[in-house]
Every structure is written in C-alpha cells, then in structure tokens.
Amino acid sequence: MIFKPQSFLKAIVLSMTITFAFNMSAPIASAYPIFAQQNYENPREANGRIVCANCHLAQKPVELEVPQAVLPDTVFEAIIQIPYDTQVKQVLANGKKGDLNVGMVLILPEGFELAPADRIPEEMKKKVGNLYYQPYSPDKKNILVVGPVPGKQYSEMVVPLLSPDPATNKNVSYLKYPIYVGGNRGRGQVYPDGSKSNNTVYNSPVSGTITEILKLEGKKGGYTISITKADGVVLTEKIPGGPEVIVKEGQAIIADQPLTNNPNVGGFGQKDVEVVLQNPVRIQGLLAFFACILLAQILLVVKKKQFEKVQLAEMNF
C-alpha cells in the first residue's frame, strides 16, 4: 500500500504502532524517525549532517540508487539499501535481545515528491510492498520518512517518486539536483534529552576503586556499581539492563574507563547522489542531431561509391 495525502494520519498511527511493537517500553528516542520530526524542522543540518546521527552514534554504510536522469512529470524509483548482518541481535529497551529494525529519511529536491498511488505501475507497487512513506511534515512533501520496520524484511526499500514539471512549476528548472538519504539499523545510543539508552557503553565518572557490584532484580535487570574515590567518597553508578559489566570488585579504575562493553550492533549512515531533470526538447534535438550525422555518413558512403564507379568507368574507357 502506498501513502496518499488523505491517509497522512493513518500513516502516522501505523508507524507509531510498529514502533511500539518493536520498542515496547522504550522512550520516544528509539522511535526513529518520529522523534526527529518532533524535534527538528529540517532533518538536514547546515553542515550537511542528517540529525539521526545525533542519537545513532556508530557509522554504518547506506546505499542509494536513482536514475542518472529523469523526464518531467515522470514516475521513477529510488532504491535504498541498509545492509547489516541479519544474524546479529540488538539490546531491546527491556534489556533482552531481539532483531534489528531499520528506518530511513529521504531528502528530495524541491518539487520532487512521493508518486500518487494511481500513477505507480503494478510492478513497482510489488517492489514497494506494504511500506508507508510519509512526508516529514505537511509543508515538506519532498522529505520522506519510514520506520522503524523489520530489518530482515526491509533492508532494501523501493520508493516511488514523481519528478516535477517546469512547465507547471515555475520554481523548478531543468538542472542537476542532489538527493540525500539517511538510513539506520538498530536502536540509538542517546535520547533527545542527552541521556544514554541501554544500547551503549557506560564509563566511570571518576577515578577510584570498585567496591561493590550489585545485580538488580526485576524485569529490566541492570547493575549498580559503587566506586570509592581516593578521598573516601563513594559514588554509585547505575547500569541499565543490556550492557555487560566488564570490571570486577576491587579493581582500580580511572575516569572515563569503560565499566561495560558496547552492546550496540547497529548504526547510521548517509549518502547523496545526483539526478538530472532532463528537458525532452534537448533529447529530441540530440536525436535529430544524431539522425543528421547518420544521414550525412550514409550520403558520404553513397557519394564515394558513385565516385568509384565513375573512376572505374573512365579507366575502362
């Protein structure tokens, strides 16, 4: 099914439902890209970085394929690939292990937008599947988001797009335009308020000695680690369920030394490509030029044959 303007609310509700299913007790930060929509007017910062990187700290690859050139008012497809090892498991919000989910944001040039359902070929609809692509906001139809969705099923996404027509949209010209994509797999390491999730490494805030490691009971688990400083002050660091403690009682540590491993197996990546909005008149002119060249070549060959016949006749005479 493909998103329609009148289905905007339905798409949001569905996306939030999927988010809840994959992150049952997680704060909104893990519900990418919804939290970006709520906190940023534009997902691409002035320096070119896509805001998803603020919470997904690990760098991973992402691929984007589009045609080299498209004609105006034409439906074409963009293929996004978010590769990862589907055998690995991530730490969920409840501290348990589960499959990774993926999400992406596609930033199109002004005038480009999601293709209407009635203009998408049946073959392309099959490639899209049941993904709902929704605008980043009501006034930014050229920015599309989706996710989180199951990574095993949607590590490759096909987005049906509609190119603008400069004849009807005076803000668009026949030029080369950039397209940006950001794609992530797995949960983030930081929440919007700056606090850590349970999908990251925890470091010691001070230097001292580990005096106690207490395992917490409950559904989410976790630990409390007591660190005694040189002046005798005891500081307690709480570790949520998910990361594994890698220090021992009696161990001397320094500030910023890791107390846990880094459980994160996901990451975020971004890429940009270019697409040319091609003027049909230019193509027609180019074809006409090639036709003239071909005709000239044919005439030259014919003329050469005639000349050779005349020479041969004169020699025989």
UniProtKB/Swiss-Prot annotation:
SUPFAM superfamilies: Cytochrome f subunit of the cytochrome b6f complex, transmembrane anchor, Cytochrome f, large domain, Rudiment single hybrid motif. GO terms for cellular component: chloroplast thylakoid membrane. Keywords: Chloroplast, Electron transport, Heme, Iron, Membrane, Metal-binding, Photosynthesis, Plastid, Signal, Thylakoid, Transmembrane, Transmembrane helix, Transport. PROSITE patterns: CYTF (PS51010). It is found in: Plastid, Chloroplast thylakoid membrane. GO terms for biological process: photosynthesis. Its cofactor is heme. Heme binds at residues 32, 52, 55-56. The chain crosses the membrane at residues 280-302. HAMAP family: Cytb6_f_cytF. Belongs to the cytochrome f family. This is Cytochrome f. It comes from Chlamydomonas subcaudata.
